[in-house]
């Protein structure tokens, strides 16, 4: 900080330098992110509510009402009447909140070290949970499809089992665990089941909409206790906009603490100060697009994913790990180390990410990516393959 302030022109000159260092979603070259270019309609709403703080909802009654309407809409999307929850910073916070609730419920009747049953495919946010909440991990094996091997679950449940986690749209491969079967096991053993649908939550319902071949992952599964769903992924809301939905009000109330100096006497979130702009943007987009609008957005992305998969699948040097269920394609190339391939693609201006298990290249087909971007990517990939032969 300077002793004296600088001119606005001088400050913004530097801002432009920083801004030009950033990748832009509109370039179509960000192929490894689950976030995307925000919908301009949502951005307009975001700016309109930029001053709001849902940490003090009595001051911002309209914004607080919008949050409840958003939670009701998301609950309806996930087949739950009378949902409880919040719009939060993202999937990590939502997952932590769910695990906090699970631990508090566990501690009502247990004194042993709590155990969390989760797959190797779980998002890294659960590693934060293990440390923050002093929880012991119990990893359930994956089957040949890289999904939870549900046959192994009953043997892993003990008196110390705090919760189980299932994934609807794994971060690395975009796969959906057998939530209906996991739900039956959770309900049978009385275990809290959290579904991380940060990615799939804004995809699967619109794939299912007016479609008889439905993926079942939500509160229709009676053993599901809570679901993470992120509007700032396929919902096109600006970052940060995550969501956590609980089946029962008593679950959310487990997070309640007194806030005597604010306009409301309690909070049920981890974060205190909480922007209302994300809620306003999400409310706007849910109303603006509706089910039909989001169905079109999702179909466009899935069609592009299928197109990309088919093109890659025809390349004899490329091995695709799993036929995509959502909008993620993971692959490797013969005779090229995965880390080397990532760096070589980056040299051509393509930002792809790596999956850890299995260790492969990971493409995420989000709404900012167009067919012409994929065609350009495939040309560059082929050039790299030929150079490495």
UniProtKB/Swiss-Prot annotation:
One of its GO terms (molecular function) is tyrosine decarboxylase activity. GO terms for biological process: carboxylic acid metabolic process; coenzyme A biosynthetic process; methanofuran biosynthetic process. Coiled coil: none annotated. Its cofactor is pyridoxal 5'-phosphate. Pfam families: Pyridoxal_deC. The keyword DNA-binding does not apply. The keyword Lyase applies. Pathway: Cofactor biosynthesis; methanofuran biosynthesis; Cofactor biosynthesis; coenzyme A biosynthesis. It is an enzyme of class 4 (lyase). NCBIfam families: tyr_de_CO2_Arch. Belongs to the group II decarboxylase family. MfnA subfamily. This is Probable L-tyrosine/L-aspartate decarboxylase. The lineage of its organism: Archaea, Methanobacteriati, Methanobacteriota, Methanomada group, Methanobacteria.
């Amino acid at each position: 900080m300077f002793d004296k302030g600088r001119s606005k022109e001088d400050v913004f000159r530097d801002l432009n330098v920083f801004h030009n260092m950033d990748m832009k979603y509109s370039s179509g070259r960000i192929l490894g992110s689950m976030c995307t270019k925000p919908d301009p309609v949502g951005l307009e709403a975001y700016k309109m509510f930029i001053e709001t703080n849902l940490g003090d909802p009595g001051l911002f009654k309209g914004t607080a009402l919008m949050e409840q309407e958003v939670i009701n809409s998301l609950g309806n999307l996930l087949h739950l009447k009378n949902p409880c929850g919040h719009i939060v910073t993202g999937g990590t916070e939502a997952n932590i909140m769910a695990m906090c609730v699970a631990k508090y419920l566990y501690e009502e009747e247990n004194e042993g070290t709590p155990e969390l049953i989760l797959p190797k495919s779980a998002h890294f946010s659960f590693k934060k949970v293990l440390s923050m909440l002093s929880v012991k991990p119990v990893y359930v094996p994956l089957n040949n499809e890289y999904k939870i091997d549900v046959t192994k679950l009953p043997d892993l449940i003990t008196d110390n089992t705090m919760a189980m986690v299932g994934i609807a749209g794994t971060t690395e491969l975009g796969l959906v665990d057998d939530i209906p079967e996991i739900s039956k096991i959770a309900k049978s053993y009385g275990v809290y089941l959290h579904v991380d649908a940060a990615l799939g939550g804004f995809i699967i319902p619109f794939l299912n909409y007016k479609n008889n071949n439905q993926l079942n992952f939500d509160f229709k599964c009676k053993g599901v206790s809570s679901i993470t769903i992120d509007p700032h992924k396929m919902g096109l809301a600006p970052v940060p906009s995550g969501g956590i939905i609980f089946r029962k009000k008593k679950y959310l109330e487990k997070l309640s603490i007194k806030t005597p100096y604010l306009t409301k006497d309690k909070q049920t979130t981890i974060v205190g100060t909480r922007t209302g702009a994300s809620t306003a943007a999400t409310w706007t987009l849910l109303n603006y697009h509706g089910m039909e609008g989001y169905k079109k957005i999702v179909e466009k992305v899935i069609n592009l994913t299928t197109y990309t998969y088919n093109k890659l699948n025809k390349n004899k040097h490329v091995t695709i790990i799993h036929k995509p269920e959502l909008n993620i394609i993971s692959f490797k190339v013969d005779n090229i180390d995965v880390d080397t391939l990532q760096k070589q693609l980056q040299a051509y201006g393509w930002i792809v990410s790596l999956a850890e298990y299995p260790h492969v290249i990971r493409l995420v087909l989000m709404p900012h990516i167009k067919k012409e971007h994929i065609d350009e990517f495939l040309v560059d990939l082929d050039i790299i393959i030929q150079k490495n032969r």
